[in-house]
Amino acid sequence: MAVQDRSVLVLYGSETGNAQDMAEELGRICQRLHFKSRVEELDVVDLNALLQPKFVIFVISTTGQGDMPHNSLLFWKRLLRKKLPPGCLASVNYTTFGLGDSTYLKFNWAARKLNRRLDQLGAATFIDPYEADEQFPDGLDGSFVRWTGRLYNHFLEHHPAPSGLEPIPDDVILPPKWSLETTIQNSTETNGHVPPSLENIPSSTLLPIPDGWTATLVGNGRLTPEKHWQDVRLISFDVPRRDGVKLACVPGDCLTIYPKNFPQDVQRLITLMEWEDIADKPLDLSQCESLPTNLFTDSKSTLRELLLNNIDFTAIPRRSFLKNMSYFSTNPDHKERLLEFTMAEYLDEYFDYATRSRRSILEVLEEFSSVKLPAERLFDIFPLIRGRDFSIANGGVHQSHPTDENKTRIELLVALVKYRTVLRKPREGLCSRYLDNIPMNSTLTVTRKPVLSPIHGAQNAQRPLVAIATGTGLAPIRALLHERLTQPSPGPMYLFFGNRNREADYFFQQEFDALVTEGQLNVFLAFSRDQRNKIYVQDRLLEEAKRIEEVIFDNGIFCVCGGSTKMADAAKKAVFEPFSEDVKDVEERKKMLASLTWWQEIW
């Protein structure tokens, strides 16, 4: 039983799901200490909600260039309101757990900004905030285990449960946060929906996603040669108007794709868990007391449909999932091994077993075959499928449909994720497999993720641009070039593009060659594997130091996109160091560099 004044609100801001998983685990830790815990994403709550619980714990990652996660922007906007008096949060006792990567320049800035603002408004920390680093030897998981251990001991020492209440042991399963028990019991039909054909193509069901757009797949062409190590696609969608409004995107925006599972994999899981008798019974989800945030499904569904469209059993299992497995194992050896993976002293073994090998949840369940998870706890145990963000690769007039003014044409430059690990079976990303296999003219629900950036618009188009990209980082750069070319008299544009091989990896070569011929674009290429001495974009930047200096003096824009923080850092060094040597006046140099527009999108 939870005592009324023992309440904890756990709030998370998450892009990839790590912060959410950790927030859910914190909620369970607090439950075991007899706190009444509530876990929510930041945008769901208003500021008054911070005043109600005894303690507030924030779990927040940093995205982009020190930005708040997408699902915390509304909360952050509320927190920044100027009319808030300095002591309005004086009764709030809080702490933060920040997730970051020290290879990024603005390490853990989201957590730092949040701490600073909460302090300004009078809130006080009840335990020191923590900044986890992806680069630690034991990664974010190790940091989380150590910090939650300190939090647990702090609560035990300073806020013990009332006399007679001992912490709930780890080997006792907690009540489910979300349960399908009622709706499964109330489904009296024995042969509800007819199972879909086991033709191995993802479901064509349009998901009811808030603010979603219906997109039709109209192009899915491979840009790299068939024998090339990487399969890079130019994927095109047509998006019709929604409620009379046309989809409008600007450079830097992303299109979010929501992948689905494959029918044969779903059947494997149903058979493995012995869910055949209930897999196709109609379920009324409106009978559930609560449902997870970001569960995109109709109220009438089936277990099979939920597995096809919503449940991510291809994800790498987190330690909390393995702990849940242990509760339902009938094999003592299996149970012991699963519990070992959740212990701090066995973090290395968990990393080797799950993370390094990229084992999926389905594969782990097949290996620990004694585990039979109850369907009633589906939402409580399994993660949900998350949308994947892809930078939009076209802009300006190139987003106009060639024949239908009511549609927007969106293009994505996508490198399909296929690789091998220590396991023999090749690994393939869920979204990559989905995009590789959905038929042409399929419809799906997508969303637009706006990215705030200081690089686009008519006024910025007049300024010179230095665009630096590697690999598929060319996507947002191309969108920006498209937009600038629709503006009258755009400023000079310099593209520095790097990849492995000119013949295989020079995306949009014909398009850029034409712009060079027309005098609208200057291109500097760095293909690292085409000669004995490797050449990178930073080398080309150094070769053009005088030109770069002119752009700096002319209030230019610098844009860096790609999949490597090392590349971004090297590019920045190549831009700044020659300039610093040439401009001897220290104050002038500092002033110019401080006012420089530098935007980067690194993933």
From Swiss-Prot:
Q: Which residues bind FAD?
A: 358, 388-391, 429-432, 603
Needed co-factor(s): FAD; FMN
Record keywords: Calcium included? no
| Chain positions recorded as FMN binding sites | 14-19, 61-64, 99-108, 134
GO terms (BP aspect):
iron-sulfur cluster assembly
Top-rank taxon of the source lineage equals Eukaryota
| GO CC annotations, alphabetized | cytosol; mitochondrion
- What GO MF terms are annotated? flavin adenine dinucleotide binding; FMN binding; NADP binding; NADPH-hemoprotein reductase activity
What's its catalytic activity?
2 oxidized [2Fe-2S]-[protein] + NADPH = 2 reduced [2Fe-2S]-[protein] + NADP(+) + H(+)
Instruction: Please state where this protein is localized.
Output: Cytoplasm; Mitochondrion
Q: Which Pfam families match?
A: FAD_binding_1, Flavodoxin_1, NAD_binding_1
- Which key words are in the record? Cytoplasm, FAD, Flavoprotein, FMN, Mitochondrion, NADP, Oxidoreductase
Return the EC number.
Answer: 1.18.1.-
What residues does the Flavodoxin-like domain cover?
8-152
Q: Which residues form the FAD-binding FR-type domain?
A: 210-457
Keyword presence, Flavoprotein: yes
Q: Which residues bind NADP(+)?
A: 472, 528-529, 534-538
Role description: NADPH-dependent reductase which is a central component of the cytosolic iron-sulfur (Fe-S) protein assembly (CIA) machinery. Transfers electrons from NADPH via its FAD and FMN prosthetic groups to the [2Fe-2S] cluster of DRE2, another key component of the CIA machinery. In turn, this reduced cluster provides electrons for assembly of cytosolic iron-sulfur cluster proteins. Positively controls H(2)O(2)-induced cell death.
The UniProt family comment states: Belongs to the NADPH-dependent diflavin oxidoreductase NDOR1 family.
Subunit info? Answer: Interacts with DRE2; as part of the cytosolic iron-sulfur (Fe-S) protein assembly (CIA) machinery.
Name of this chain's protein: NADPH-dependent diflavin oxidoreductase 1
What organism is listed for this UniProt entry?
Answer: Gibberella zeae (strain ATCC MYA-4620 / CBS 123657 / FGSC 9075 / NRRL 31084 / PH-1) (Wheat head blight fungus)
